[in-house]
């Protein structure tokens, strides 16, 4: 979630070598020639892959049969605050037990999830003896703690998700710097070095390396970057020139070790991507990780979410589609998209970061219009961004009654809508594609309409 939301919602190994003058080394005695003993071949890497292998092909995520795959999931993070205070005091076994129990409950409740966005929560990797600088900042990162809990907590949780049929998208600890003492990120800054270190460690882990069940989202919500012109921003060509350099170096670091699918973030809290169409991230198995909240992209919102990139106004479907086409469309035309944060619910519930309604596709509201845009794009995976696994586990597929709705059963809130939409996706009911024909009965004059990014 955005750094503005962080108060409420979730928001380097070195090998040493010594050198000396060879002339100072003692002369070794000659050894009579003997047949060389064949060297043992290195043991092949164990294959931890369990789910159908996915890869990026053009603008699509595909399986080995060449079929397009769009994933639908949810999120988990691992700190007492976001785990309903069900455990405390770095009790790792209780953390594992609680979160596995939540996964079991979510599956039993009938949710049709096939991926999870897993936060490698800084609760575990922070060195709390260091001074606090910012919420979920990288400044207190301990490589020793990170390696320990990657082994003992995060990888075991990833394996558990995979055993339940879910791919895992790992997100690095914390959020990108933006507020004081920072203005944003900058090529060569300490945050880039932090990300390089994190992904160097993760991409070499024996149970993660080349395990295509596990993917990587490179960073959470970059806001502004220092451009080649020296100015901080999120939309200019100069900013995207440096965004390409910034994230390409991390992609290259990962590719030194493995081929796992990578999801690259944009700028502007992961809402701005157009510049990547010119300054392309190079390599295979690369898509883009997008965030989408009510009020962003010109969409409808009951209340502005406060990042400064949206509003509480909106005109229903058409402005939303135009905003999506402008800000995300240029990369959706060349690579798959994964929306790794999205939610909505009426303001009265105060239960989600985004305040809006499901509404109707083509009309007012946020949720149904987003689904329509994603379905017509044909290459958008997305999820329910939640820090409340216990609510998903408690979900009952029993309709509420008007006047007595709750957050979980109100059709205008995202849980009810997503629960049923994701079941439809899993059953193959929803067909992605553009409309084939549109008739306006009784119309003689020419009309210009926009649907799914296409003008008619």
Named regions from a protein language model:
Residues 1-12:
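Single conserved hydrophobic/aromatic residue that forms the stacking wall/gate
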Residues 13-44:
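Bacterial Sec-dependent N-terminal signal peptides
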Residues 43-136:
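N-terminal structural segment of carbohydrate-active enzymes
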Residues 51-54, 78, 82-95, 183-215, ...:
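Extracellular glycoside hydrolase catalytic/binding regions
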Residues 75, 120-122, 172-174, 220, ...:
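A mature extracytoplasmic/lumenal domain signature
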Residues 176-177, 223:
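Short aromatic/hydrophobic helix-turn
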């Amino acid at each position: 979630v955005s750094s503005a939301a962080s108060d409420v919602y979730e928001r380097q190994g070195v090998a040493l070598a010594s050198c000396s003058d060879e002339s100072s080394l003692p002369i070794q005695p000659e050894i009579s020639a003997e047949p060389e003993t064949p060297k043992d071949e290195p043991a092949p890497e164990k294959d931890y892959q369990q789910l159908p292998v996915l890869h990026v092909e053009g603008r699509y995520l595909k399986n080995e049969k060449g079929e397009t795959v769009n994933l639908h999931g949810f999120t988990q993070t691992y700190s007492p605050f976001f785990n309903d205070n069900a455990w405390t005091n770095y009790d790792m076994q209780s953390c594992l037990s609680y979160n596995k129990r939540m996964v079991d409950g979510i599956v039993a409740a009938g949710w049709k999830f096939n991926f999870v966005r897993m936060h490698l929560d800084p609760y575990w990797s922070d060195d709390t003896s260091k001074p606090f600088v910012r919420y979920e900042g990288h400044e207190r990162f301990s490589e020793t703690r990170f390696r320990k809990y990657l082994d003992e907590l995060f990888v075991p949780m990833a394996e558990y998700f995979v055993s339940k049929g879910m791919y895992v998208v790992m997100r690095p600890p914390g959020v990108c710097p933006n507020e004081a003492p920072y203005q944003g990120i900058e090529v060569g800054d300490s945050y880039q070095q932090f990300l390089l270190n994190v992904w160097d460690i993760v991409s070499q882990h024996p149970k993660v390396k080349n395990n295509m069940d596990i993917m990587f989202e490179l960073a959470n919500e970059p806001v502004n970057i220092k451009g080649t012109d020296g100015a901080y921003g999120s939309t200019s060509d100069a900013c995207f020139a440096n965004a390409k350099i910034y994230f390409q170096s991390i992609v290259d670091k990962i590719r030194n070790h493995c081929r796992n699918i990578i999801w690259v973030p944009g700028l502007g809290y992961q809402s701005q991507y157009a510049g990547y169409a010119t300054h392309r991230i190079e390599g295979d198995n690369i898509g883009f990780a997008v965030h989408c909240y009510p009020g962003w992209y010109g969409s409808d919102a009951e209340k502005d979410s406060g990042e400064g990139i949206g509003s509480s106004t909106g005109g229903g479907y058409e402005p939303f589609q135009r905003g999506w086409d402008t800000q995300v469309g240029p990369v959706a035309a060349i690579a798959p998209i994964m929306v790794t944060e999205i939610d909505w619910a009426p303001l009265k519930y105060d239960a989600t970061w985004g305040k809006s309604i499901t509404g109707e596709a083509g009309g007012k509201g946020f949720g149904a219009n987003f689904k329509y845009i994603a379905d017509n794009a044909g290459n958008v995976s997305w999820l329910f961004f939640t820090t409340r696994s216990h609510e998903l586990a408690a979900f009952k597929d029993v309709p509420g009654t008007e006047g007595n709705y709750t957050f979980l059963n109100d059709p205008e809130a995202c849980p009810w809508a997503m629960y049923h939409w994701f079941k439809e996706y899993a059953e193959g009911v929803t067909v992605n594609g553009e409309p084939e024909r549109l008739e306006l009965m009784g119309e003689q004059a020419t009309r210009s309409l926009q649907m799914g990014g296409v003008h008619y």
